[in-house]
Amino acid sequence: MAFFLEALLGGLMAGMLYSLVALGFVLIYKASGVFNFAQGAMVLFAALAMARFSGWIPGWLGIEDKFLGNLIAFVMAGALMFVLAWLIERLVLRHLVNQEGVTLLMATLGITYFLDGLGQTIFGSDIYQIDVGMPKDPIFLFEGVFEGGVLVNLEDVYAACVAALLVMVLSLFFQKTSTGRALRAVADDHQAAQSIGIPLNRIWVIVWFVAGITALVAGIIWGSKLGVQFSLTTVALRALPVIILGGLTSVPGAIIGGLIIGVGEKLSEVYLGPYVGGGIEIWFAYVLALVFLLFRPQGLFGEKIIDRV
């Protein structure tokens, strides 16, 4: 039982991180109706900014306190993501209002390669470390209940708590604030939203900035675990099955989908891997996504598309 709980908790914590990356896709799609292929590049760019700023700031400002240095680096990286959001709206999205979805999709591909090159030009291409003080040592829980206890990585616990808190804040933002309702209106119909006075340009800046902050938090967590390197862009590929499973238009769907895939990967690898030679964790999510594409393409919580003729 203890072994099962270890795998279950590990899957839930990994699932929260998947959900965090998937939220960036959902936020952009809900506000602009475009699938943002640049989300992985945004995670990398934000992580690079955080890693380099946290290394440069002590020398620039003479700050010895590590927490204060990381806090200033986070604020600076967040400000950079806001500037990035403003530039994307000003230079790209503003000129593509009401264009076909494939046009917007190609625009996000261009943004992807631009961010990859810009990040390498500004911050370099080495592997960097992000140290925000999360403990690395594992701990044992429920030692009084199970013999030997349940082994849990404390860093994963902290990361999952941060991800869960951000997911909760974003869910409340979308459901309870006037800006969140305006974002949903823009997603439904750009022209109708503009006709009732919703400023489309400002809404797009807000949603790309929120997605940028989400990418920043995801980049910090993944960078702390794996190091900041250019392969970090592939973390977005791990989120693709999540949004297929949960639904591209659903914030709760991104959360539930991430948890299902995280738990499914861990349990299948632990209990089925020995019988098939291992490696299930690599392809499990994609096979599950393929099943949903065949039988429920809108996902668990996505909106079913009905064409009227």
Residue ranges and their predicted role:
Residues 14, 148-228, 251-257:
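Helix-loop-helix "hairpin" substructures at the membrane interface of multi-pass membrane proteins
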Residues 31-87, 91, 149, 272-275:
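Membrane-embedded helix boundary and interhelical linker motif in transport proteins
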Residues 4-53, 87, 91-103, 243-251:
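Single transmembrane alpha-helix segments in multi-pass membrane proteins
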Residues 60-111, 118, 256-261, 265, ...:
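Alpha-helical transmembrane segments within multi-pass membrane transporters and channels
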